[in-house]
């Protein structure tokens, strides 16, 4: 269960695990990998840091085989495509 005390590493692990449920070719933002009320429980600074972690993962050796960073939304949220 996600709450204000959930560590960044735990949040990142949730993202990586949830990617299994995303179909290849689907475009998404990190926020969509969490239920609405869970995302709202994560502090703004941790949401920003989590976004940076996912972006680094997508550009790294392991993540680049799974995710492709795309452009950003008008709200400046990074979009990704599942490979």
Name every feature range the model reports, one short phrase each:
Residues 1-3, 36-40:
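Charged, low-complexity surface segments at secondary-structure and domain boundaries
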Residues 1-9, 18, 72-83:
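Phospho-regulated, low-complexity intrinsically disordered regions of nuclear gene-regulatory
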Residues 6-27, 40, 56-59:
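Positively charged, polyanion-binding regions of nucleic-acid-associated proteins
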Residues 8, 38-53, 66:
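Short, positively charged loop/turn segments that connect secondary-structure elements
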Residues 26-36:
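Short acidic, hydrophobic short linear motifs in intrinsically disordered regions
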Residues 32, 56-83:
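Charged low-complexity interaction tracts in eukaryotic proteins
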